[in-house]
Structure formats: structure tokens, C-alpha cells
Curated annotation (Swiss-Prot):
Designated name of the protein: Ribosomal RNA large subunit methyltransferase E
Lineage: Bacteria, Pseudomonadati, Pseudomonadota, Alphaproteobacteria, Hyphomicrobiales
Basic residues bias: start-end ranges: 14-28
Chemical reaction(s) catalysed: uridine(2552) in 23S rRNA + S-adenosyl-L-methionine = 2'-O-methyluridine(2552) in 23S rRNA + S-adenosyl-L-homocysteine + H(+)
Record keywords: Cytoplasm, Methyltransferase, rRNA processing, S-adenosyl-L-methionine, Transferase
Length: 235
């Protein structure tokens, strides 16, 4: 059912309420209500975006300018495709010769302007395959990867940090000089070594939390800009 809720401007916004159903836990019902009433979810549905996560990348790029026409981009953990959509539009990728390549072990529908690989990024063959399909080194490496949550905050943080570190190692090994790296992490206090690695290899490194990332979420993004080049990485 829906219920009218007054907005600050005097307009009315319909708020969706989920009826109580046998077998549906109250926590699941609250999550579903929040999801259905999320303005970013509604915006994604109306604008044809694959997920609300697309707006996280849009907001980060609007502020930090990491994507530009003509760039080549690799998107790690691409499913369901929201970031690929944003990247392809931002770099003006040609559907006939995509300059955006996404990879995920989950199946996802094709994204215009992006090539999609269904394979595990941690597969030994994945890095070479990504560069082969892209046709050269990327200007930007994106990673919205997160390990499946267990409900144990410390464990979830450590598992996602492992993915973030793997993404950072990959970015350092393939990026063009001057390139950018953006990756999801969780607040948890164990990312010191990763930050040190990135600061040695990029001229600017900091955390960002876009408005589309929920306030109660422990999710953060690490943004590393202006890659110093392979010589710095090997030094």
C-alpha cells in the first residue's frame, strides 16, 4: 500500500508501505520498504539505470572529474552494470569499438558502449583478458567489488579489503601514467598498508563518500588520482 507524506515544499510524496506477510521477517520488510522508498532507486528506475550505485559514480565524477571523453575504462565487479552505463556515457564509448570493459562472475545484460566479461576477476587469466578486450592500458580502473556479507562487521571488512587490495595491485600494474583508480572499501581501520601503497604510486589519495551512499552504511570509496607510472611502482 502507499501513504501520502508531505514534503517540505508542500507537495505530497507517496510513500510505499509493505504489508505484513507470513514468513516475511520484520527486518526484511523494513529493508524492502526502505528500498522501495529510496529516491535513488526511484530515480534509477525512471532513468533506466541498472542500479542506484550508478549515482555514486556520477556524484564522485561530478566532484572529482575522473572520467572524460576518449578515456579507456575497466570496471571490476561490474554487475548489474550501473557503473558501466555511467562510464560508457562519460567517455563517449563507441558501441562498435567499446572503450569500457566490465568484468564480473555474475551474468549481466549487455551494456551499450561496454564489453562485458563473465569471469572471476581473481582468475589468473582475467588481467590479460581485460587488457586484450580493451585494446590497451586503461586511463581509469573502477572497482565496486564487495565480498558477500556475513553479518560480522570485522569479517566483512577484511574480505572486502582483500578485493580492494587485489584491485589496487591490478590498477598499478596496468594504468597509464596519470590514470585514476576508484574502489569500494568498508570502514574498519585496517587499510593503512593499502593507503601507503596507493600514496607511493599516485599523487593524490583520499576517501570519498558520495551522497548516494547511505549515511548508516560503513561503505567508503578510495580515490587515487594521477598515477605516477610504472617506474614509481617498481622503485
Amino acid at each position: 500500500m502507499t501513504k501520502e507524506k508531505k514534503a517540505g515544499s508542500g507537495t505530497r510524496v507517496l510513500k510505499t508501505r509493505v504489508k505484513k506477510k507470513r514468513g516475511l521477517k520484520s527486518s526484511s520488510r523494513r529493508w524492502l520498504e526502505r528500498h522501495l522508498n529510496d529516491p535513488y532507486v526511484r530515480r534509477a528506475n525512471s532513468e533506466g539505470m541498472r542500479s542506484r550505485a550508478a549515482y555514486k559514480l556520477i556524484e564522485i565524477d561530478d566532484k572529482h572529474h575522473i572520467l572524460a571523453p576518449g578515456m579507456k575504462v575497466i570496471d571490476l565487479g561490474a554487475a548489474p552494470g550501473g557503473w558501466c552505463q555511467v562510464a560508457a556515457a562519460s567517455v563517449k564509448s563507441d558501441p562498435a569499438k567499446p572503450s569500457v570493459v566490465g568484468i564480473d562472475y555474475l551474468e549481466m545484460d549487455p551494456v551499450p558502449g561496454a564489453a562485458v566479461l563473465q569471469m572471476d576477476f581473481l582468475d589468473d587469466a582475467a588481467p590479460d583478458r581485460l587488457i586484450e578486450v580493451l585494446g590497451g592500458s586503461p586511463d581509469v580502473v573502477l572497482s565496486d567489488m564487495a565480498a558477500p556479507t556475513t553479518g560480522h562487521r570485522r569479517t566483512d571488512h577484511l574480505r572486502t579489503m582483500q578485493l580492494c587490495e587485489a584491485a589496487a595491485d591490478f590498477a598499478i600494474s596496468v594504468l597509464k601514467t596519470g590514470g585514476n583508480f576508484l574502489a569500494k572499501t568498508f570502514q574498519g581501520g585496517t587499510e593503512g598498508e593499502l593507503l601507503s601503497l596507493l600514496k607511493r604510486n599516485f599523487r593524490s589519495v583520499h576517501h570519498v563518500k558520495p551522497p548516494a551512499s547511505r549515511d548508516e552504511s560503513v561503505e567508503l570509496y578510495i580515490l587515487a588520482k594521477d598515477f605516477k607510472g610504472r617506474q614509481a611502482a617498481e622503485g
